[in-house]
Amino acid sequence: MASSAQSGGSSGGPAVPTVQRGIIKMVLSGCAIIVRGQPRGGPPPERQINLSNIRAGNLARRAAATQPDAKDTPDEPWAFPAREFLRKKLIGKEVCFTIENKTPQGREYGMIYLGKDTNGENIAESLVAEGLATRREGMRANNPEQNRLSECEEQAKAAKKGMWSEGNGSHTIRDLKYTIENPRHFVDSHHQKPVNAIIEHVRDGSVVRALLLPDYYLVTVMLSGIKCPTFRREADGSETPEPFAAEAKFFTESRLLQRDVQIILESCHNQNILGTILHPNGNITELLLKEGFARCVDWSIAVYTRGAEKLRAAERFAKERRLRIWRDYVAPTANLDQKDKQFVAKVMQVLNADAIVVKLNSGDYKTIHLSSIRPPRLEGENTQDKNKKLRPLYDIPYMFEAREFLRKKLIGKKVNVTVDYIRPASPATETVPAFSERTCATVTIGGINIAEALVSKGLATVIRYRQDDDQRSSHYDELLAAEARAIKNGKGLHSKKEVPIHRVADISGDTQKAKQFLPFLQRAGRSEAVVEYVFSGSRLKLYLPKETCLITFLLAGIECPRGARNLPGLVQEGEPFSEEATLFTKELVLQREVEVEVESMDKAGNFIGWLHIDGANLSVLLVEHALSKVHFTAERSSYYKSLLSAEEAAKQKKEKVWAHYEEQPVEEVMPVLEEKERSASYKPVFVTEITDDLHFYVQDVETGTQLEKLMENMRNDIASHPPVEGSYAPRRGEFCIAKFVDGEWYRARVEKVESPAKIHVFYIDYGNREVLPSTRLGTLSPAFSTRVLPAQATEYAFAFIQVPQDDDARTDAVDSVVRDIQNTQCLLNVEHLSAGCPHVTLQFADSKGDVGLGLVKEGLVMVEVRKEKQFQKVITEYLNAQESAKSARLNLWRYGDFRADDADEFGYSR
């Protein structure tokens, strides 16, 4: 027991009973109480105390199941009110008690006082005073305690309290109901509304016996969604507790036993009712989980009405802290770094219906399996034709629908990946093939769990696990709920309808079938297709939905590096850049919807033609990225000009297949200026910077996407491996990375080193300059150097104009240009070259208005008169505009024509 105290007294008098203390655990009846001590490292000891000198009615007792002829014993009058009086007064309270008598059978009789000493309320006297117990007959009032009991009884009689009231007390006898004929109907009739109840018995931490009020149904309630360690019954009838079973039972007893609670009846299982017990101090289900006394169980967690995710979170809390039953717990992803547990990646391929291939920010590829789901399977595989080759995608019911759902939803998109567990590699057995190590994860896009969406459409099923198997989806309950909905609604695999059949003809390499299809495909013009496989940069396998066939497709007009091939007796090595070309094509078109134009076929039955993705010609893209060369057969194609233009641009960059390209020397012929005509070939550019001397920097719009991709990859790389401050020693002329005022990193070139705190840099892709401390600089990785992508900012000057020498006038002109064209797209045409930079005319993209001519019209600049014949028409237009500005006395001309006297002095020429 918790503690004891010895009352004082003279050594010569009668022995004074020892005062002991405890906490009321349970009230057995109006005169029998169980007292327990304080817990110390486990459930405390307990003892039954029978109140001395009084008697209360016996509570109802159910007949023993081993005695078929026995009958249930009902409550005696006023027995239940007496029990309730003590229950409400004493449960969980600290009391003190004395033992006055102990029988040979071990029954103890004594007095119980509410509080810490015998000055507290005498429980026996209170019972008698309320008319809920009587003084035992035959007891002689020979001591003060018995005298007080007699007085209390007389007072109760006089006040007609309890059993001394009129009537026989039959209204206090409960109509106890030990069985329920239809538990399911009983549960449903309460519509999951809380029912008042008293917990009468705790079998283990998660199973209790409850008295439902006001109808007195005595039912066994199992807590929904969890299971505590239990007591295993041995052959000799004894019970052996599982680890922490006794502790879990005490945890529930100390909080719920004989407490007033509310129970939500949620379902039933084997005549036992599943429910959730609500107490003002909290939810015992969640508390048991959080303290490590229970684990979640899949078979009943779905009926838990207060949110299964709360139970999983509570269990996870205990697991992470290795509390009690989880003391030896090891997380499925314990060996993974946080960056490997959660990351964002781009989906590159869908593998059947339960796995995807993603591209990480590092550029690496990784296969991710969707946690806890199983793709459609072929039923009755033993009955299949052994000679027929199985094509899972088309022959397994709903596999194609599942793959298409994932393909359309995910391909090319960025998804959030949360790794749930790593399934280790397993060797092959007689019935199960070998499996390599698998990374299983929850994949979401736009907040949607892809596995859950698949299951809800009936395109996958949920794997059932052993209860102790923790390697499962972190959203396993949602998957189970989604599957239940799919079954209820008859979706997909759970449908009673006829299974969809996909009759897809594979004519790859079948020359005869290919010849039959060729005329149809040629006449069809552009046909829709899905790229199913990429063999090399220019060789693909396509699925044509309208024709429901698979074909091998070769890109026309190009010569792509050949990959490695396995030949009889040897392996033929691939040509340089063959792997890069294959990867380029894969990343661009694999499992994408494309359009194809079939022109012809080869001897092996492979179709030859043009493939378009998002309006771009794949052949042209491969040539543009220096991964293919133009083939002479392209001459008769309408795409020949585009191919040649792309090849010429690739040659100039001298990358990949053109890395060793040497331009053939051409004898230079000086043209006669009078015979040359002005060439007007405007190209789209993006103006990024205007300098103080009215030069400007532009980016080529056609290569803008390459720059965006490089910047994204570079910043991801920097985020993963940030430069160490001060570790970079800048040198003049060196390329580096610099952190701009917006906090982002850009490619730059060191122009001047004044001191470690003053480094002059030039941003090579934008044309602006800045002075920075060396702490905001870092080494430029070779993966993002100018060899990978040349500097994108090119400097130009306006043709046909003279920039004012006066500082204020020049500032006005620069400000006007900044307002009009900085950070906008324009059209640029190179007019003539000079020692500094090319001189160009620039047009607004929308109105096609000449920017330089506009400056002349505003009187902000003067015309530079050139003598070349091809420019005379343009010069005349500029001079006319200048005369108009002069007449209107705009800006430079506001004081008239100043050039007559001081033109030479100020650097102007007429």
UniProtKB/Swiss-Prot annotation:
GO BP, sorted A to Z: miRNA catabolic process; mRNA catabolic process; osteoblast differentiation; regulation of cell cycle process; regulatory ncRNA-mediated gene silencing
Gene Ontology CC: cytosol; dense body; extracellular exosome; melanosome; membrane; nucleus; RNAi effector complex
Modified residues (N6-acetyllysine): 193, 641
Domain of life: Eukaryota
Post-translational modification: Phosphorylated by PIM1 in vitro.
PANTHER family membership: EBNA2 BINDING PROTEIN P100, STAPHYLOCOCCAL NUCLEASE DOMAIN-CONTAINING PROTEIN 1
Known function: Endonuclease that mediates miRNA decay of both protein-free and AGO2-loaded miRNAs. As part of its function in miRNA decay, regulates mRNAs involved in G1-to-S phase transition. Functions as a bridging factor between STAT6 and the basal transcription factor. Plays a role in PIM1 regulation of MYB activity. Functions as a transcriptional coactivator for STAT5.
GO MF, any single term: RISC complex binding
SMART domains, alphabetized: SNc (SM00318), TUDOR (SM00333)
Complexes and interactors: Forms a ternary complex with STAT6 and POLR2A. Associates with the RNA-induced silencing complex (RISC). Interacts with the RISC components AGO2, FMR1 and TNRC6A. Interacts with GTF2E1 and GTF2E2. Interacts with PIM1. Interacts with STAT5. Interacts with SYT11 (via C2 2 domain); the interaction with SYT11 is direct.
UniProt protein name: Staphylococcal nuclease domain-containing protein 1
Broad enzyme group: hydrolase
Short name of any one Pfam family annotated for the protein: TUDOR
Domain Tudor as annotated: residue spans: 729-787
Lineage of the species this protein comes from: Eukaryota, Metazoa, Chordata, Craniata, Vertebrata
Tissue: Ubiquitously expressed.
Position of the Glycyl lysine isopeptide (Lys-Gly) (interchain with G-Cter in SUMO2) cross-link: 513
SUPFAM superfamilies, per database record: Staphylococcal nuclease (SSF50199), Tudor/PWWP/MBT (SSF63748)
Positions of the TNase-like domain: 18-166, 193-328, 341-496, 525-660
E.C. number(s) listed in UniProt: 3.1.31.1
Modified residues (Phosphothreonine): 103, 240, 779
Modification type N-acetylalanine: residues: 2
Residue positions where Phosphoserine is found in the record: 426, 645, 781, 785, 909
